Every structure is written in structure tokens, then in C-alpha cells.
Amino acid sequence: MPGIFTRWRQFGRRYFWPHLLLGMVAASLGLPALNNNAEPAAPAEASTSHTGTLRSFDSLALISETSRRSASFGVDYWQQHAIRTVIRHLSFAMAPQALPMAMEESLPLNAQHLALLDTLSAMLTQDLQPAAAQVQPAPRLLPPLSFTVSAWIRQVQGIRAGPRLLA
């Protein structure tokens, strides 16, 4: 039984976690552009009377997330780390060959490596314009009709008996 746990731990350390991190970085390469263009999902209907407050907190989080994302102009730290790692590996792979015949055979591969290096370095050095933050107007809050004890208890205690609004 301990052998199974040891093998599982080694599998996780050697294969699972590095590949999971690499997959997350690779999958997120296109997400900042999509997040700025997509419309945010409508907040779920809350059971309390503070839906306006909840919506404003949601939009506050959306604005802070947008400003945090736009500060890096679309490429965050982990994406830059992955790109730099690939550039490093490609530069070591493109080290001068000792044999001249091996150099002639690998010319198409070197051209492909050079194109990939050029593209990756352009991704790191290119200054993209940050996407404009889409700020939604705050929802209108309806003024209370009049103060009643039953309405106050309903709001504070969460008790609801009868219609929500008087048509």
C-alpha cells in the first residue's frame, strides 16, 4: 500500500502539476482579449432587498479586475514566464552545430525556430493598447414608498408575507 502512495506522489510531482500549470498558462493566452469584449453575466437575483448593493459590489470587482488586467496590457506574469521559458529552450536548441552536414539538414527547422522566436519576442516587447474598461451604469434604486414596521421586519428578518411591491 505505501508503494502506491509513493508512486502517486511521484506522478503528481513529476507529471501532473507541471503539466497542469503549463496547460493553464497556455489556455489563458487568449483570455484577456475575450474578457474585455464579452458582456458580464447578469448577477443572480438575491433574496435580500440589497440587490443594488450587491450589483455595485459585482461591478466594483469587475472594474478592479479589468484595471488589473489592463495594467499588463494583455500578457500577465505567468504568460511572460512561459514565453521566456520557450525562448530560452529555443535559443539553446539553436546553438551552433559542430557538424556542417547537420546544419544543412536542419535549415528548415532553424527557419521555423527563428520565426517562432521572432513571434514570441514580439509578444513580450509589443506595447498593446489597453482595452477600454466597460463601466456599466449603476442600477436605479427605487425610493421606499413609506415606512411601515412590517416592511422593516421583512427587510431585516427576511420575512416575506404578501406582494413585494404595491403595483
Swiss-Prot record:
UniProt entry keywords in alphabetical sequence: Cytoplasm, Periplasm, Signal
Any Pfam family hit: SecM
GO cellular component, one term: periplasmic space
InterPro entries: SecM (IPR009502)
Ranges in coiled-coil conformation: none
GO molecular function, one term: translation regulator activity
Compartment(s) where it occurs, according to its Swiss-Prot or TrEMBL record: Cytoplasm, Cytosol; Periplasm
Record protein name field: Secretion monitor
Species in which this protein is naturally found: Cronobacter sakazakii (strain ATCC BAA-894) (Enterobacter sakazakii)
